[in-house]
Amino acid sequence: MSCQGAVSPKGARKLHDADVVYLYDGSFEGFLCCVYESFAQHELPFAVWTPQRETATLYPVKDIATDPAVARRVFASFGKKLGAETEYLVSRDFLSGQEDKELLLLRFLHLAFALGPGTVKREGHPVVAPLYAMKKSLDWEVDKFQGFVRFEEHDGMLGAVIHPKNYILPLLRPHFCGRFPEEDFMIYDAVHQAVLLHEKHNTRLLELAAPLELPPPSA
């Protein structure tokens, strides 16, 4: 079944709640493959977990492999069939720290593909409202950390440690790279074990396998 066919409501069987858990790698591409599986099987899983959130369950666990080609087709269908506003909202809300974000996004996408691109504007709908609540939390936290990140010098580089609820480093990147274009700096997200590293005019987002300890601040 093609990806575009999987996300089309035309001729689709009725969506059903499935006693199954999706397990994926935690990446946005991996989530898009969960979207594909959900539409292909016409099912809404009981839960969607990453390896970090995996726990004991009586439900069967379905491993969802990350396929970049499938992910690209699914994402392209958002803009083509649902519009840029939906594409933006889903992408941004995936950065939320809310544990059930994947299920909330899946429910919304099933509704949006059934009702059309105007679904995203129905902010009071019980399926749509949680997405705007996640966006509000993200926006608030981005504004907060844009103004309150405290840097110290560590071996010639500015460094800061933050503890955000949401994964906001990608959203902080434009602000701090614009603010300190000539400086070498790093922002370490101790909650999500990720680093925004700006060095010699190059910027990278790095996911770490273990917690990072910064050296003592320079005297």
Residue ranges of model-derived segments:
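N-terminal ordered "arm"
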Residues: 2-3, 7-68
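Charged, alpha-helical interface segments at or near domain boundaries
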Residues: 49-144
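Ampiphathic alpha-helical segments that act as solvent-exposed interaction surfaces
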Residues: 36, 180-182, 211-219
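Acidic, Ser/Thr-rich peripheral helices and adjacent loops at domain boundaries
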Residues: 61-74, 202-217
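Internal, well-folded beta-alpha domain core
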Residues: 118-210
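Short, hydrophobic/amphipathic alpha-helical patches that form generic packing surfaces
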Residues: 30-41, 106-111, 174-178
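Glycine-rich loops and low-complexity Gly/Arg-rich segments
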Residues: 46-49, 72-75, 184-188, 210-214
